[in-house]
Amino acid sequence: MAASTLYKSCLLQPKSGSTTRRLNPSLVNPLTNPTRVSVLGKSRRDVFAKASIEMAESNSIPSVVVNSSKQHGPIIVIDNYDSFTYNLCQYMGELGCHFEVYRNDELTVEELKKKNPRGVLISPGPGTPQDSGISLQTVLELGPLVPLFGVCMGLQCIGEAFGGKIVRSPFGVMHGKSSMVHYDEKGEEGLFSGLSNPFIVGRYHSLVIEKDTFPSDELEVTAWTEDGLVMAARHRKYKHIQGVQFHPESIITTEGKTIVRNFIKIVEKKESEKLT
């Protein structure tokens, strides 16, 4: 049975490149902070199995009733053991979003589907996509069904799941560094709607999706640095599958909360389409 706790995290939490444990949430008054975070007891399972998009489409999860906020499924946050996960959660809580957090080895994708999520957020984390538990399988099986947002390693999971290669950045480690990022969403509403172009982001990574092997038949680049590194991408067919290489929850990313808000808007738009 899942244990439930309420949290309050610090937006200014520094990030360690070697972090392998997430922040311990402190209990707060549920009357002042109604956001609920569900945390399952740890049980490690080997659940990764590469699945096809066609299989995901033929085994869709139940539809979400959207006429009452209490009837929404949660946005599921897959925590890849990163110290910034709860800063992302803090943004979602401040935006009035109901969500649940599970570590990447605490449940299977089938168990995740049964929670009827309205969206999925794959958090940053140490290591490579192969260290991300159910994240890769989640991209392939739930991505076609509900909006999916990958952050940092979450974007790398999207890239690898659809055939890209994850390599060390040719420009070295970026740890707490700011960069100017340019974007082009081709006039469509997306993660960067309403942002300055370019805008400033905070970066904490040493790996990137390799430009030469970028799976352009499946994905399209939506944002990049001035030196040409991929900073965001989305699926060509399932445009609600998208991710960013930088950290929107970092204080360096001055317009980061707008990006999280835009993800929630994408979730709401997807729900409204189910009613038409």
UniProtKB/Swiss-Prot annotation:
Membrane-spanning parts: none
GO cellular component, one term: chloroplast
Gene null: resulting phenotype: No visible phenotype under normal growth conditions, but mutant plants are insensitive to inhibition of root elongation by ethylene.
Highest taxon above the source species: Eukaryota
Catalytic site: 152, 247, 249
Tissues/organs with expression: Expressed in the central cylinder of mature primary root zones, including pericycle and early lateral root primordia, and vasculature of cotyledons.
Protein name (record): Anthranilate synthase beta subunit 1, chloroplastic
